[in-house]
């Protein structure tokens, strides 16, 4: 959900001013931590691509070299897209998201994360920056750490693997 509490998975939204500042700050942190980024790959969603561009500017990385990959999109929330989440959470559990009409299920997202992981490890570059989304990011972490995708249904697991906006998570 976005800062307004709306399910925004595949819905195109713009970065807020705060999101822009977070992206710039992430770029500055990365420049100190990993001064050499060989490649930036991001979700093709507008908010993610804009985040990647802001980070790239801070790194001095050419924006025209950012690769968009549809495997990195956020989980699709089906009929919940664009709706406020508070009402859903008052009557449902996280596992119920798999039953929302037209929503991507956790097993489907896990398969996509596996494909994304295979794509990323086959890139012939040392330092690849991936700019993606929270739910999908957790799925990718589970692939790398070999944690079963069913853990996404566990509230504590989601808290333990929560990814904040513009947060740096080093995987490999």
Each model region followed by its residue ranges:
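Active-site-proximal alpha-helix that buttresses catalytic centers in soluble enzyme cores
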Residues: 1-61
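Phosphate-handling substructures
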Residues: 14, 55-115
